[in-house]
Regions:
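Membrane-interface "cap" regions at the ends of multi-pass membrane proteins
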Residues: 1-51, 64-68, 76-80, 88-89, ...
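Helix-loop-helix junctions that connect adjacent transmembrane segments
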Residues: 11-15, 132, 163-239, 243-296
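Extracellular loop-to-transmembrane helix junctions
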Residues: 17, 39-142, 247-251, 257
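TM-loop-TM module centered on a large, flexible mid-protein loop between adjacent transmembrane helices
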Residues: 92, 124-128, 196, 243-311, ...
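Membrane-interface loop-to-helix entry segments
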Residues: 135-188, 244-248, 370-384, 439-453
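C-terminal membrane-solvent junction of multi-pass transporters and transport-like membrane proteins
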Residues: 160, 333-343, 381-434
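A generic transmembrane alpha-helix motif of multi-pass inner-membrane proteins
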Residues: 372-377, 409-467
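Small/aliphatic-rich secondary-structure junction motif
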Residues: 481-539
């Protein structure tokens, strides 16, 4: 098998409708990225201590670099698949699979970590116990519920996401303004924003601060969700960059503001230990005013937005696996549809089970999930940046409706954006820090990637396709195409010697679970009566049947 381009012909049954505008995309993007602060703030404070706002700000700058890369690539290739699609155009199917498989781990962890963050917030409403058994058991129940909802065909509602995003933003703005006016002590906060200063309260070492910044990257994961919806976006060249700019601007302000006012009412040590699983509710519960009703309120909106984020992760798994399946990167069973509900039940079940297993393996530790989350997310982001740089160099004349700014010129035609270069280096360093310092996240992440590559190679060999080729899908459009449903197939037994016709009938029967009826017709000459005995021909017919 040579690593050459190959072509496969597919029947184009239906195009995704382009119905989403910039507001709907913003709602989806904010729902995925904005939900992360409800668990990422605690793990960031655990390491960055008093420098938590700085860590979030630095991670936010890297997020801007990544967001601009996705804005350019998603408008250049407005197709589902995200970084897997970008890598396919920039490299080949093998690199595309590695990027997509890492992204799939990211989606599975979105399901797991978002669902895992819900029970601690619900205790502010219902008073549930905070034991690991309740925490893990509640998470498994939530993921199971989401599986059945998606099995029956529940859709992601852009309007619900938009309303919830607005409620969350307004609630956080209220907290920042109220605490900023009544409680904020900036000289006190700034005095503790020191890094590597001995004998200073809340001053992390430089190594701790770097780990805290890496953890802060978790707060900005989820931008991939906008890229996944590129094929359903009206005017993607305008809507995608606009929604991404809105998302990154609002998140940077809110994240920095929440972290600053948070450290005005609670120590980073307490935030990273006692409230590591529910940092936002922990902050507002310490307010000298309104804490008794602010904590349940934030518990409610946190649970809702985290539930939507977890559900979006499960939907993202199915969208991504369907895109990869079209290019023969994963076996057909992963995107096989349920005969009744027309949903990818196998992939939904497999990924829901994997998410539950990961939660159980975490033993109730948010850090374990955050490390593994970073492992998959940074692989996806790294290949997105790398794909942009490679395509900018290989094909500078390619039509790009949106181009990342701050470019370094190379000759008259080529230019490379500084943001993509910075993003490439930063995401690789964060991924490397997980590999070096986080053995649990590293081991599980590497096992996931190795098993995926082995599956890919075996499947490609079975299909007699090149491992590193670049498969091209040629879609044939048929006006008013309607899918065929076969229940009964009639086979002329006189052509029983024609094995090709018989094999075709058997393959159709297997695909559609249809029955086959074989018929042997005996022609009677006009000169003979209809009931005339024709023993020899009847014997031949019986033999054929």
């Amino acid at each position: 098998m040579s690593d050459s381009s190959e072509r496969v012909v597919h029947l184009e049954k239906k195009n995704l409708k382009r119905t989403l505008g910039a507001l709907e995309l913003f709602a989806v993007g904010y729902g995925d990225v904005g939900s992360s602060i409800y668990y990422a703030l605690g793990v960031t404070a655990l390491y960055a201590l008093g420098a938590t706002p700085i860590a979030l700000l630095i991670a936010g700058l890297v997020f801007i670099c990544t967001a601009l890369t996705y804005a350019e690539m998603s408008t250049t290739f407005p197709e589902p698949g995200g970084t897997a699609t970008f890598s396919r155009y920039a490299f080949n199917d093998l690199v595309s699979f590695i990027a997509g498989w890492g992204l799939l781990l990211d989606y599975i962890l979105t399901v797991a970590i978002s669902a895992f963050a819900i029970p601690p917030y619900l205790k502010y409403i219902f008073g549930f116990p905070g034991t690991p058994f309740y925490h893990i058991g509640g998470t498994v129940i939530i993921i199971t519920l989401l599986f059945f909802l998606n099995l029956f065909g529940t859709k992601h509602s852009g309007r619900v996401s938009l309303i919830l995003a607005l409620i969350t933003i307004l609630s956080q703005v209220f907290v920042i303004l109220a605490a900023g006016i009544l409680l904020l002590n900036m000289p006190y906060i700034i005095s503790h924003m020191k890094i590597g200063v001995p004998n200073t309260d809340w001053s992390p070492s430089w190594w701790q601060f770097m780990k805290g910044t890496a953890m802060a990257m978790v707060a900005y994961t989820g931008i991939e969700s906008i890229a996944q919806l590129a094929a359903e976006t009206k005017k993607p060249a305008v809507s995608i960059p606009r929604s991404i700019k809105w998302t990154m601007s609002i998140l940077l302000v809110l994240y920095f503001g929440i972290s600053v006012v948070g450290l005005s009412v609670i120590s980073p040590v307490e935030l990273g230990t006692t409230y590591i699983d529910d940092p936002i509710a922990g902050i507002v519960s310490k307010f000298p005013f309104g804490g008794e009703w602010l904590a349940p309120w934030f518990g409610l909106i946190a649970a809702m937005i985290l539930l939507i984020a977890s559900n979006a992760g499960l939907i993202g798994c199915s969208r991504l696996i369907f895109s990869m399946g079209q290019y023969y990167q994963v076996p057909h069973m992963f995107y096989k549809l349920h005969p009744r509900f027309r949903t990818p039940h196998v992939s939904l079940a497999v990924f829901a089970v994997i998410a539950c297993v990961i939660v159980i393996l975490s033993k109730g530790e948010m850090l374990f999930l955050a490390d593994l989350y970073n492992f998959g997310a940074q692989i996806a982001f790294f290949f997105a940046h790398l794909s942009l740089l490679i395509l900018r160099w290989k094909d500078p004349a390619m039509k790009r409706p949106f181009k990342a700014p701050f470019n370094i010129p190379f000759g008259k035609k080529r230019s490379l954006p500084i943001t993509a270069i910075v993003g490439l280096i930063a995401t690789f360093c964060v991924w490397l820090s997980v590999v070096i310092t986080k053995p649990q996240g590293r081991n599980l992440g590497i096992i996931w990637m190795v098993l995926g590559v082995v599956m890919y190679l075996v499947y490609r060999r079975k299909k007699n396709l090149a491992y590193g080729g670049q498969l091209t899908i040629e879609k044939i459009k048929i006006p008013e195409y309607k899918p065929m449903h076969l229940k009964h197939i009639l086979v002329d037994a006189r052509t029983i010697g024609n094995t090709e016709a018989l094999q075709t009938a058997c393959q159709l029967a297997k695909s559609y679970k249809a029955k086959i009826t074989a018929v042997h017709v005996i022609e009677i000459p006009d000169s003979l009566p209809a009931d005339a005995p024709m023993l020899k021909r009847e014997e031949q017919g019986e033999g054929a049947l």
